[in-house]
Regions:
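Hydrophobic membrane-insertion alpha-helices, especially the h-region
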Residues: 1-9
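Terminal connector regions
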Residues: 11-18, 89-134
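Short extracytoplasmic/periplasmic juxtamembrane "stem" segments immediately C-terminal to an N-terminal membrane anchor
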Residues: 20-38
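Short, surface-exposed loop/turn motifs at beta-strand boundaries within globular domains
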Residues: 39-41, 54, 66-68, 102
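Structural beta-strand segments of beta-rich domains
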Residues: 42-46
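Asparagine-centered strand-capping/turn motif at beta-strand->loop junctions
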Residues: 47-53
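Short, hydrophobic/aromatic beta-strand segments
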Residues: 54-62
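Intrinsically disordered, low-complexity Pro/Gly/Ser/Thr-rich segments with frequent PxxP/GP/PP motifs
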Residues: 65-100
């Protein structure tokens, strides 16, 4: 029973709720190293900034309720993290997010707050601009 609950929790974190996670999100383009490390490439990125003076462990990012990235390392205090959108993988397969084919419509962030509570913030986007947060 617990395993089933955790599976639902992992697949649909926005349905669970919790206090807000103090992290800012931006969408844009950034220069990232190529896979072989031989050069750099301008690509679509998601930029996350920890707005607090404490690290956020158990940090995960989800795009469009389908593409997930779970970060092993905590998001450090005041850290600015820039990630290529193509590194996000489908929760049910190994397919990668394609920002050319699909626009980012929602970003859901989860992580552990200093109180031990699980923080959740969801950002809704339209044409790359935040239109709502909850």
């Amino acid at each position: 029973m617990v395993a089933a609950g955790l599976s639902v929790y992992a697949m649909f974190p926005e349905r669970v709720g919790g206090p807000p996670l103090p992290v800012a999100v931006e969408l844009g383009k950034g220069v990232m190293p190529t896979a072989d490390g031989a050069g750099k490439l301008l690509t679509e990125v998601i930029v996350l900034t920890n707005l607090t003076d404490h690290p956020i462990p158990r940090f995960s990012i989800e795009i469009n309720d389908q593409y997930l990235l779970i970060r092993d390392a905590p998001l450090a205090a005041k850290e600015r993290l820039e990630l290529p959108q193509r590194v996000f993988t489908d929760k049910r397969s190994n397919h990668r997010f394609n920002p050319i084919k699909y626009p980012v419509e929602a970003v859901t962030l989860t992580g552990q707050l200093p109180t031990g509570a699980r923080g959740v913030t969801r950002f809704l986007f339209e044409d790359g601009v935040i239109i709502d947060t909850h």
